[in-house]
Every structure is written in C-alpha cells, then in structure tokens.
Swiss-Prot record:
The lineage of its organism: Bacteria, Bacillati, Mycoplasmatota, Mycoplasmoidales, Metamycoplasmataceae. Consists of a catalytic RNA component (M1 or rnpB) and a protein subunit. RNaseP catalyzes the removal of the 5'-leader sequence from pre-tRNA to produce the mature 5'-terminus. It can also cleave other RNA substrates such as 4.5S RNA. The protein component plays an auxiliary but essential role in vivo by binding to the 5'-leader sequence and broadening the substrate specificity of the ribozyme. SUPFAM superfamilies: Ribosomal protein S5 domain 2-like. Keywords: Endonuclease, Hydrolase, Nuclease, RNA-binding, tRNA processing. PANTHER family: RIBONUCLEASE P PROTEIN COMPONENT. GO terms for molecular function: 3'-tRNA processing endoribonuclease activity; ribonuclease P activity; tRNA binding. It comes from Mycoplasmopsis pulmonis (strain UAB CTIP) (Mycoplasma pulmonis). This is Ribonuclease P protein component. Its EC number is 3.1.26.5.
Length: 111
C-alpha cells in the first residue's frame, strides 16, 4: 500500500475515532469517517507487545491490505484497531478476518 494512503498523525487518528462510527468484531475494530480519498491507519495498543512485534503486525496488515484490490475506491478514512486475539492468528486467518471486516464495513456504510 502506498504511503499516500496511510494515516500517520495522532490528530487524524483522534478525529476519526471521535466520529464514533465503527464496525466491531472479535478481533478488530474499524472506525471510519467519510473523506474524498481513501486512507487507512493501523493501531496496536502498547500493552499487547513490544515495539518490534507491533511493527511486525502492522507490516503484516499492510501487506494484506496491499493484496486487496478495490480498497482505493472507498472514499473513507479508516482506523483499524487490533485486539489481542488477532495477533495469535496465522497470516491466512488474518487475511480472511480483514476481508470479512471490509465486507461488513462496505455493507454497513450502505445503510
């Protein structure tokens, strides 16, 4: 996923989370906000792992998102917050979980 699609700044994360629009599952939480372009940020709480492991999981998630084709057509900013259960899954299960959540997100935003 290209860098232009990443959310990096803390105030951007906070603005999206404070909008309180969300899709929740057992392993992930998606907060979203309408925007004219697609952007995504991944957040893993500090108490789950050290910095090296958190960055590893973020890279895994970005690799999964890179494989999903129709993401850039979405006109939303999304903050993905990872829960502890998600980190125990293997790569293919993580990919299925993210795809399932994105489908739920697409269905939710149509309502």
């Amino acid at each position: 996923m290209k860098k232009i699609y990443h959310i990096r700044k803390n105030w951007e994360f906070q603005a999206i989370i404070n909008s309180k629009r969300q899709v929740i599952s057992k392993n992930l939480i998606f907060y979203y906000q309408r925007n004219n372009t697609f952007k995504i940020g991944v957040s893993i709480p500090k108490k789950f792992a050290g910095a090296v492991k958190r960055n590893f999981y973020k890279r895994q998630i970005m690799a999964i998102l890179r494989d999903i084709q129709d993401l850039t057509n979405l006109e939303y900013k999304i903050v993905m917050i990872v829960r502890k259960n998600f980190m125990a899954l293997d790569f293919l299960e993580k990919k299925k979980e993210i795809q399932k959540m994105l489908e739920r997100f697409k269905n939710e935003k149509r309502k």
